[in-house]
Amino acid sequence: MQTCSGKGIKMAFLDVQSSSTPQSLPLLLFSHREGGGRGAGDPGAPAVVPAPVSAPRPASSPARSESRSPPLTLISRHITCCSCESPGDVLLSGRGGGGGGGGGARTGGGEGEDRRPRPDFSRVTAVAIPGWMEVESPPHPPPQPQVCPTPSQGAPGHGRAGLPEGKGPGGRDWLRSQSSRCSRATLFGHRAPSPAAPRRGRLPAPGFPSLHSAVSLF
């Protein structure tokens, strides 16, 4: 948990979607007001107030400076309250409204703010001031292990020490070649070839006779 210093308005940019229009809105600016409890059981909790967001206008309409607050649904909830010094889910879904009655909410337009729509609305992507809010990304799923041939595969009844010699299926040379191909396939993101699949060198080229038919011509 990061230690936050300073008091006042603390902001974070969050990804949102509008429930009234299919077009995704840009970034919603949240202002963090200290004091003024949100719930009855926690009078000291800071209030999270959504600031007005400039609605996307059609290309044909003239530019206007006014802004309205469409219904907003927060997608990202992986964030930690930093001003109250305790981890918790302080983001609330609701209707964006005019600053909570003059509580110090500020609209967007500051330096470094990106107003372009973002294609991904699954997590918090930007923070206004680093160190004031700690962003927690969702945990990534563990990578699936690559299934590579082992000495027990393809050679039933043979242990690691009793492998049959030779280049046939189950032999040491065969397992070594399969393991090397498996590692190369894992490196390039492809699945390893199945042992039962024919080798590429044995396939005749399209439009040409096979080796046996070519030999039989002479």
Swiss-Prot record:
Residues 138-148 have a biased composition (Pro residues). Residues 43-71, 191-209 have a biased composition (Low complexity). Residues 94-110, 156-171 have a biased composition (Gly residues). Residues 30-71, 93-120, 133-209 are annotated as: Disordered. It comes from the Eukaryota. This is Putative uncharacterized protein FLJ45840. It comes from Homo sapiens (Human).
